[in-house]
Structure formats: structure tokens, C-alpha cells
From Swiss-Prot:
GO cellular component entries: cytoplasm; nucleus
Native organism: Saccharomyces cerevisiae (strain ATCC 204508 / S288c) (Baker's yeast)
GO molecular function terms attached to this record: tRNA 2'-O-methyltransferase activity; tRNA methyltransferase activity; zinc ion binding
InterPro entries in the cross-refs: Methyltransferase_TRM13, Trm13, TRM13/UPF0224_CHHC_Znf_dom, Znf_CCCH-type_TRM13
The entry's keywords: Cytoplasm, Metal-binding, Methyltransferase, Nucleus, S-adenosyl-L-methionine, Transferase, tRNA processing, Zinc, Zinc-finger
Keyword Nucleus: yes
Descriptive protein name: tRNA:m(4)X modification enzyme TRM13
Protein's UniProt keywords contain Zinc: yes
Record family assignment: Belongs to the methyltransferase TRM13 family.
The organism's taxonomic lineage, starting at the top: Eukaryota, Fungi, Dikarya, Ascomycota, Saccharomycotina
Further comment: Present with 1230 molecules/cell in log phase SD medium.
Ligand binding (Zn(2+)): C75, H81, H91, C95
A single BP term in Gene Ontology: tRNA methylation
Zinc finger motifs (CHHC U11-48K-type), residue ranges: 72-99
Length: 476
């Protein structure tokens, strides 16, 4: 084992002919596959990793090169990669992040901050959370649940027959994602979202590889093949895929492959393949209307979907839909609103943002109504604590831990008086915090989309996914 300048212990792998990084990855039981310089022991990324872990300079030189002390620093545009400090200026001009930041400059659907909260709050301002904030927030949560009568969300785990026939047989072991997709699709079916499938378009926010859209498309295609003869051949469907990241192994082609297979099995059905439009953009900066189809007299409708839309992206998405005149209000062509349904499976409330949260007034009203006399809680501090508490409901338990075990939840605060609860109580508090954030979103949707029903459901059991809450919005 090696240990450099008080850095983490590193197992030295056997030398190889290629100049391979000497860092040994214990979890994968192999050494790093990156190539290193002949003057260095490690690749640049593992050098940076070790420096972060040890909070010190790690020796990475052989011979006289050790005296030069070139330093690698995180790229200011993307801290996930590092550069030589003496080449930083040159790197910034050619960094891929520079190109990506200007990728949409000339696009009609791009407007910086369009779906943000107009700078109402600057979440970049650091808010220090104390043990007192944490304890008061927990006590306030209990009062909120008692006063607002927040019952447990209904479980609506449904099974889509197509998924059972086509998808589950392909998965002999891990079916958790398929079970979730099946339930979400069938909940959309029950909500009437697939009526008149020949004119349905879908928008998937935070689509990633678009696996969810692939199976939505598969169900849509089977519905099209079962249409009566008078409707055959008239379908015009589109999938708009929104994501800010670059994704590998995308499912876009699978949608076309599924169509080809279904078409070959039903050659007499004159159905058309759905078109696919993938847009790489942050939802914060997205104007939907330039992307969507809308002409007077058409019967096109849109269903907005997402499976595990992360943190603040859910708030930005709800604003994005509400800001679209084509989806939500009369557009410039005099057409009726095109929105038919919304289905968003939410996750990662711990990365929600108090400045961009969609319903500040709701959380503020809870704080003002239920905080104790002399409380130091404000909207900002309470929301920050909520995001921290949310992880308690989804982080799971360590092996051998019992639900009755006692934990001190303010242990990380130096000098704080102990505040002890059981493991089970901690999990419940996490779920309560998550519910408050989701409830505020639900209230926003009900106020904004008055012609729609809106509800929160548990679409699978928690043993399938701990992130098992979805918002379902459909026409009254």
C-alpha cells in the first residue's frame, strides 16, 4: 500500500507495459485504466480525487519532475474535471462547457431563466442551519401534519398488460424499473390520457436516455393498431425529449425499431412512425411554444411525462408548462389549450431550491401558522431544513439496524444538546418533509390549472422504490 503526504492509502498494482495509472480501485478490484504521463504515478483525475480526500498535496512525480510542483485545479466551468493551473486560461477557451453554454444561443426556444422565479430569492446566498433550526423544524412538521390532516397518500400500483407481455419476460431478475414504468403508464391510461391516440404527442422532461418514452411509445403504437378502420392511417404523433445532459445508449432508436416490428406484424394497418425531437437544454431556459405544433382546427394534444424528475427540475417543469400559451392558455393562433395530462414521478427533494420552489407562499403560510412563539424559523431556513430532512426518508438503513434504535439527529452540530429519536421516527420525519414539498406543488397546480384534476399518488410500494410518489394531472 502507498500513502503520499498523508494522503489516502493506495494499493500499488503490478506494473504494466503501458503507462497506466497506479491507483487501485478496491471496489472494482482492478487498477485505473487511464493512461498516465511517464513522469507521473497517477492519472490527473485520481490525483485530484486523492487531494480532495486528504485535503493536501499528493506526491505524483518521479525524479526531478517532483521539484516542478505543477498543480491541477478544478475547471471553473465544470468542477468534475481538472486542468493544469498554468494552462487554465488556454483551457477555458476550448473547454466543452464553454461550447455547451452557448449551444442554444440562436434557438427560438432558448431564453435564460425563463422558468425561474425572477430572482425573487438568491439561493446562492449561504444560509447557515443550526441545531435549533433543525429541532424547531421537526416540531413544526408534526404540528403541520396534525393541523392540515395530511393522510397517507393512496397506493395505486397498477399493471399495464403490454408491459407484462413484452417487457417483463425480458427481465428475469431486476424488474423494479419495469414495474414503475408499468404502473405510471397504466395510471395515465386510467386518467384518460391515451384517448384519441392518433393525435397524441408526448413531452418527456429530464428524459435521460428516454427509456420511459420508449415504453409509452410502445403502448401508444399498440393502441394505434387497434383503431377502427376510419381512423387508420391518420396518426401524427411526436415525442419531444428534453434533457440538459449528454446521454449515451439512448432509446430514441428503439422507438423506431418498435414501430418497425409492430408494422411488420400488422402490415395491413397504415400507421405512421412517431417522430422524435430531442432538445439539449436546461428546463430553466426552455420556452415550449416554439417547439410545439399548433394550428387552428387541429386536434393535437400533449401529455407531459417524467420518471424521477430530480429536485428543482420538477418546479421548473411545472412553470415551463404553465408558461406555455399553447399548452395552458390561448395561443396567438386562437387555438384551444393543448395540454391533456401530466404525470411526473418526483425524486431527490434534497436538491430542491428555496429560490426556485414553485409555491413559496404555501410553505410560508405553514411557517407563520404553526411555528412556536419565539421561533427563529423563516421560509428560507425552514425550506433548507426540509431539503435536509427529506433524505431521512429515502436513505435506507444500515445492515443490522433496528427501527427502535436511538439516534441523536443533532450530533453533527458542535455543542448542541442531544435530540434523540428512533430510526423509525427519523424515516417518518423524512417522509413528512417530502410530503410538505410535494403538497405545495400540488396546491400550485390546482390553482394554476383549474380545468384539471390533480392528485399525489404512491405508484409503487416502497420496497420497489423509496422514491415512489407521482403527481397525476388530468382533465376534469
Amino acid at each position: 500500500m502507498l500513502q503520499d503526504n498523508n494522503g489516502p492509502a493506495v494499493k500499488r498494482a503490478k506494473p504494466s507495459e503501458r503507462l497506466q495509472c497506479e491507483y487501485f480501485m478496491e471496489k472494482k478490484k482492478r487498477r485505473c485504466g487511464m493512461t498516465r504521463s511517464s513522469q507521473n504515478l497517477y492519472c490527473s483525475e485520481h490525483l485530484n480525487l486523492m487531494k480532495k480526500a486528504a485535503n493536501s498535496q499528493v506526491h505524483n512525480k518521479n525524479g526531478s519532475e517532483a521539484e516542478k510542483e505543477r498543480e491541477r485545479v478544478p475547471c471553473p466551468l465544470d468542477p468534475n474535471h481538472t486542468v493544469w493551473a498554468d494552462q487554465l486560461k488556454k483551457h477555458l477557451k476550448k473547454c466543452n462547457k464553454t461550447k455547451l453554454s452557448h449551444l442554444n444561443d440562436d434557438k427560438p426556444y432558448y431564453e435564460p431563466g425563463y422558468n425561474g422565479e425572477n430572482g425573487l430569492l438568491s439561493s446562492s446566498v449561504k444560509i447557515d442551519i443550526t441545531a435549533e433550526h433543525l429541532v424547531q423544524s421537526i416540531e413544526l412538521l408534526y404540528k403541520v401534519f396534525e393541523g392540515e390532516s395530511m393522510d397517507e397518500l393512496p397506493l395505486r400500483q397498477l399493471n399495464n398488460k403490454l408491459m407484462s407481455l413484452k417487457r417483463f419476460p425480458q427481465l428475469p431478475s431486476n424488474t423494479k424499473h419495469a414495474v414503475q414504468q408499468s404502473s405510471l403508464i397504466e395510471n395515465l391510461v386510467d386518467a384518460g390520457a391515451f384517448e384519441r391516440p392518433e393525435s397524441l404527442n408526448f413531452i418527456e422532461f429530464g428524459c435521460g436516455r428516454a427509456e420511459f418514452s420508449r415504453y409509452v411509445s410502445l403502448y401508444l403504437l399498440t393502441q394505434l393498431t387497434s383503431l377502427p378502420a376510419e381512423h387508420s392511417g391518420s396518426n401524427s404523433n411526436e415525442f419531444v425529449l428534453i434533457d440538459r445532459a449528454t446521454n449515451r445508449m439512448k432509446f430514441d432508436k428503439k422507438i423506431k425499431d418498435d414501430f418497425s416490428e409492430i408494422k411488420s406484424n400488422s402490415p395491413s394497418k397504415p400507421i405512421s412512425c412517431p417522430s422524435i425531437k430531442r432538445i439539449k437544454i436546461d428546463i430553466r431556459d426552455l420556452k415550449m411554444d416554439p417547439i410545439l405544433k399548433s394550428t387552428p382546427g387541429d386536434d393535437i394534444q400533449y401529455v407531459c411525462i417524467s420518471k424521477h424528475l430530480c429536485g428543482v427540475a420538477t418546479d421548473l417543469t411545472l412553470r415551463c408548462i404553465g408558461n406555455s400559451s399553447i399548452l395552458h392558455g390561448d395561443d396567438n393562433n386562437g387555438c384551444n389549450p393543448k395540454l391533456k395530462a401530466i404525470c411526473i414521478a418526483m425524486c431527490c427533494r434534497h436538491v430542491c431550491d428555496y429560490g426556485d420552489y414553485v409555491n413559496r407562499s404555501y410553505v410560508t403560510s405553514l411557517v407563520e401558522k404553526y411555528r412556536a412563539h419565539g421561533s427563529i424559523l423563516t421560509y428560507e431556513t425552514f425550506f433548507r431544513v426540509l431539503t435536509k430532512l427529506c433524505s431521512w426518508g429515502t436513505c435506507g438503513r444500515k445492515p443490522g439496524t433496528a427501527i427502535t434504535d436511538i439516534v441523536n439527529v443533532v450530533e453533527s452540530f458542535e455543542g448542541a444538546e442531544p435530540y434523540t429519536i428512533t430510526i423509525k421516527e427519523r424515516e417518518n420525519i423524512g417522509l413528512m418533509a417530502r410530503r410538505v414539498i410535494d403538497e405545495g406543488r400540488l396546491v400550485y397546480v390546482k390553482e394554476k390549472f383549474t380545468e384539471f384534476n390533480a392528485e399525489l399518488i404512491r405508484y409503487v410500494e416502497s420496497d420497489v422504490s423509496l422514491e415512489n410518489v407521482a403527481m397525476l394531472v388530468y382533465k376534469k
